[in-house]
Regions:
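A glycine-rich beta-to-alpha transition motif near the start of alpha/beta enzyme domains, typified by
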Residues: 2-120, 159
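ATP-dependent small-molecule kinase catalytic core of the GHMP/sugar-kinase superfamily
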Residues: 95, 105-174
């Protein structure tokens, strides 16, 4: 059986340091079932190809709201590269003329500072908040840390192919 799925919507594909998403301006477009849409558009063989789908929406608590869906359709809380592209999108497409904006995400409201040159955003700085270092909140297998009585895996010694390394497990919210 051949699966047929037709979707007509305007979108923009953007990337921040290679982390690419399909962006939809939900001030103009409606996206029903964003989890399924994310899976379809993210497919690099039969879709547009991306790390996921980001919806740019109106917000009652901030200047904008960002809803992010991963390529597997799961909803993410936050993506630093993705939110920087949201800032560029809303400024460059005329949704705001502010050079500091607030964007509501599933991990809270983020404040972004936009550096503008010749009417276009050249750089975006975002306060991502405090990093998560507790292994069970990242998540990461915590057996070794628990056995050693550690609450965090910071500068933890490991061996990879016989070579010694130190690792720190950290999450910024997705």
């Amino acid at each position: 059986m051949i699966e047929r799925y037709f979707l007509v919507m305007k979108f923009t594909k953007m990337h921040g340091i290679g982390n690419d998403y399909v962006y939809v301006n939900c001030f103009k477009e409606q996206v029903t079932n964003p989890s399924e849409v994310a899976k379809k558009v993210s497919d690099r063989h039969f879709g547009i190809g991306s790390d996921g789908l980001i919806l740019i929406k109106p917000s009652d608590v901030a200047d904008f709201e960002m809803d992010m869906y991963n390529a597997d359709g799961s909803q993410g809380a936050m993506c630093g590269n993705g939110i920087r592209c949201v800032a560029k999108y809303v400024y460059d497409y005329g949704l705001t003329d502010k050079t500091q904006i607030r964007v509501a995400t599933k991990s809270g409201i983020k404040v972004l500072d936009l550096k503008v040159k010749d009417g276009k955003v050249q750089e975006v700085c975002v306060d991502m908040g405090a990093p998560i270092l507790k292994p069970d909140e990242i998540p990461v297998d915590v057996q070794a840390a628990e056995a050693a009585g550690e609450e965090r895996l910071v500068n933890w010694p490991i061996q990879v192919n016989g070579a010694p390394y130190h690792m720190t497990c950290v999450s910024m919210g997705n």
